[in-house]
């Protein structure tokens, strides 16, 4: 069976890989890596203690809070990070945005994994960008207030403001595997960069200046929506890609990924426990480290024989979505007690429609900021039509059984580690098989000549 899938050369490569004996040099490399890893963990732990709030949560404290709806996520206490996620109630009915506030802590309540800090807001100072956030939210108020779900989607997809997104809507997006479209992600960052570059192309701007302005726009946008760990990851990788083009350097996505992780952990060591960040990195790891090796083998076997077109692109998107799902499975099992099975298939249609919808919403936002409101009569009906199709697709998808399965209880953490160790071994094997097949094809072509 294995021979039919990967061929004789693949089976032979698997045997070599399995039976390979460690040399003294390999053993030295493993020991060196282990020592560096141990030192890194010790330094990280020391740094963690330095930036963590270790005092008693009682009395008046200075909180840095992100308000979203009826609650606010506590980012810092007295300019130090909490060792756990905590929230406060938005008793002042503050609008969406970031606030520095004096807070009189009365009680701390923890239920399961959720911590609520109860008390009184005694004073606050809001971020200067909050006014601009409100300005954009008012645009959606004027245009989509009567379209309940489109109104909620536009606020979430453009600004990351999810207070209007209903539980039913969230559940449908999660079940169909399209939840990444209602949070600010790498998709949004890419659309911002591509959109700015296309706009600047129309004014015939010099190559370097085009990307310099794109970097400025990207920085402003990410600052506006808030530099959460997932957004910061996408921003750093996007910024490094733009800088590579400005400096005429080769883009290196692997290096960008590692640098983004280091920067995020230096700025906020507790970001490593953030679920959205873990899912974000899992997706990017699948795109950078898993998919290219799978695609190489499939390309040799049959993809290169297919004509370029919708069918080939759809097949590639399906394989990419499957790779992302495979890498993300342990996180879904551990945090959500769900096993994704076939939800990746809906990405074939859902992602293109959702991407076009987000592009349209970005266009509407920009046109209204530039006071070109007379174009709303064209773009708003288009957005409504696309969203209706998108919502209909998600509704039908939510009725399909077996996209995800509920699992009784959270899996143990050691299972997650074992899964990823086996996945790393599998990636190395698939990579070696791909190189072996390519070498064999080259040898055959040389013999022909």
Residue ranges and their predicted role:
Residues 1-56, 113-117:
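N-terminal leader/targeting segments
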Residues 11-28, 204, 307-311, 404-410:
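Short, Lys/Arg-rich N-terminal segment immediately upstream of the first membrane anchor
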Residues 53-72, 101:
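Structural detector for short beta-strands of small beta-barrel domains
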Residues 75-77, 108-128:
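OB-fold/S1-family single-stranded nucleic acid-binding modules
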Residues 78-94:
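Beta-strand/loop nucleic-acid-binding surfaces
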Residues 92-94, 104-110:
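Short, charged beta-turn/beta-strand-edge "cap" motif at the junction between a beta-strand
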Residues 121-237, 242:
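Aromatic-rich juxtamembrane segments at the membrane interface
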Residues 227-420, 427-441:
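Internal transmembrane alpha-helical bundles of multi-pass membrane proteins
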């Amino acid at each position: 069976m294995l021979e039919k899938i990967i061929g004789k050369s693949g089976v032979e490569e698997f045997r070599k890989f399995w039976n390979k004996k460690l040399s003294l040099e390999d053993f030295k490399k493993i020991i060196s890596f282990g020592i560096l890893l141990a030192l890194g963990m010790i330094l990280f732990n020391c740094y963690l203690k330095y930036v963590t709030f270790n005092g008693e949560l009682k009395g008046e404290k200075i909180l840095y809070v992100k308000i979203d709806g009826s609650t606010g996520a506590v980012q810092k206490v007295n300019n130090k990070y909490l060792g756990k996620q905590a929230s406060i109630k938005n008793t002042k009915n503050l609008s969406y945005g970031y606030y520095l506030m004096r807070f009189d802590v009365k009680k701390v309540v923890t239920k399961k994994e959720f911590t609520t800090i109860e008390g009184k807001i005694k004073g606050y100072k809001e971020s200067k960008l909050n006014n601009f956030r409100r300005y954009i939210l008012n645009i959606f108020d004027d245009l989509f207030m009567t379209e309940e779900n489109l109104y909620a989607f536009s606020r979430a997809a453009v600004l990351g403001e999810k207070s209007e997104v209903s539980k039913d809507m969230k559940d449908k997006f999660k079940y169909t595997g399209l939840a990444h479209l209602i949070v600010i992600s790498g998709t949004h960052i890419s659309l911002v960069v591509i959109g700015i570059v296309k706009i600047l192309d129309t004014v015939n701007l010099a190559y370097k200046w085009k990307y310099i302005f794109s970097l400025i726009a990207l920085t402003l946008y990410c600052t506006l929506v808030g530099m959460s760990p997932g957004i910061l990851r996408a921003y750093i990788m996007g910024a490094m890609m733009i800088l590579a083009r400005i400096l005429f350097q080769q883009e290196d996505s692997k290096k960008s990924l590692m640098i983004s992780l280091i920067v995020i952990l230096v700025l906020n060591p507790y970001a490593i426990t953030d679920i959205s960040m873990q899912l974000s990195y899992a997706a990017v790891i699948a795109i950078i480290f898993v998919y290219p090796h799978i695609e190489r083998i499939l390309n040799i076997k049959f993809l290169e024989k297919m004509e370029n077109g919708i069918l080939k692109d759809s097949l590639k998107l399906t394989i990419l979505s499957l790779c992302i799902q495979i890498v993300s499975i342990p996180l879904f099992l551990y945090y959500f007690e769900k096993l994704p099975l076939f939800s990746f298939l809906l990405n074939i249609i859902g992602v293109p429609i959702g991407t076009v919808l987000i592009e349209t919403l970005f266009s509407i936002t920009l046109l209204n900021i530039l006071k070109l409101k007379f174009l709303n009569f064209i773009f708003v009906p288009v957005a409504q039509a696309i969203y209706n199709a998108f919502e209909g697709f998600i509704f039908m998808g939510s009725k399909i059984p077996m996209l995800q399965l509920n699992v009784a209880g959270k899996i143990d953490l050691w299972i997650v580690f074992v899964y990823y160790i086996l996945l790393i071994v599998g990636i190395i094997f698939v990579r070696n098989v791909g190189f072996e097949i390519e070498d064999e094809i080259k040898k055959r072509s040389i013999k022909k000549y």
